Amino acid sequence: MATSMLGSVRGPRPFGLANLFHRQPPRDAWERVRRLPGPSAVRRSVAAASGPGIPGSHLYCLELLRKRDYESYLCSLLFPAECQRSASALRAFNVELAQVKDSVSEKTIGLMRMQFWKKAVEDMYCDNPPHQPVAIELWKAVKKHNLTKRWLMRIIDEREKNLDDKAYRSMQELENYAENTQGSLLYLTLEVLGVKDLHADHAASHIGKAQGIVTCLRATPYHSSRRQVFLPMDVCVQHGVSQEDFLRRNQDKNVRDVVYDIASQAHLHLKHARSFHRSVPAEAFPAFLQTVSLEDYLKKIQRVDFDIFHPSLQQKNMLLPLSLYIQSWRKRY
């Protein structure tokens, strides 16, 4: 039997995730969601937009998000109008760094790209950003919100260390990586929203860890197709599972137990972040809209009994825009 912080269970293993809908959404909710910019509108705007720096740099970021991080793209559209541009710049910056590892054939090239971004961030704080769309938009966000350079550099440093194709040695190591990347990104997002609050920071830390864990799980089928496994080794050893089991897409119970334990840890971080939501300023809630997609994935993997390779886990949730809008309207996370 799988044993995690949720305890031993038999048969279907419920997380006990809270129901998303406690109140009736506004009657025109779907109409409002339909008015969000669609892919074609973004592409037309990219071609037509102009502004200081590089013409269309903001909409370049939106298009990058739409293609590479659709959930963040949707979330950025639900930020307060005065924060949308900066929020999308931060997320586009994260995408630029995240795709380095998968887009280079040699670690040396990856290190060179990370060095470019380190210098770019240093130059932003000297009002001399490189002529690159994401860098231009990030520079504007830095100037507008006085963003903390330490968080930006910490994301780059952690992504750089992660260029090695090695599995996480432990769950703690995965959580540290998530805190230094996703957590730092959320701290910056709170700065964009003008939120300075210890409870909000505490929630950001737990949600960032949940995001990192879920991202690791979601990417496992892709990584296994490239003969790579990054799931925490200590959890695998505990259940007698080898990397080869994941490469062969083994669906034995002990493999599912590994996935269950890892998913349980993400659920616990979400649960803890939500346990003190009444102490978090409502102004911080847009930063935490991603909890909708995290909860959606955890529910889906629970329904397939933690079969991480089940085809349904790779399908887009067509109701995600509506769910995000309702969560935004409810001012909950």
UniProtKB/Swiss-Prot annotation:
Location of the transit peptide in the chain: 1-44
The keyword Mitochondrion is assigned to this record: yes
Function: Involved in the assembly of mitochondrial NADH:ubiquinone oxidoreductase complex (complex I) at early stages. May play a role in the biogenesis of complex I subunit MT-ND1.
Family in the record: Belongs to the NDUFAF6 family.
Localization in the cell: Mitochondrion inner membrane
Record keywords, A-Z: Membrane, Mitochondrion, Mitochondrion inner membrane, Transit peptide
GO biological process: biosynthetic process; mitochondrial respiratory chain complex I assembly
Keyword Transport set for record: no
A matching Pfam family: SQS_PSY
A GO CC term attached to the entry: mitochondrial inner membrane
Signal peptide residue numbers: none
Listed name of the protein: NADH dehydrogenase (ubiquinone) complex I, assembly factor 6
Superkingdom of origin organism: Eukaryota
Native organism: Mus musculus
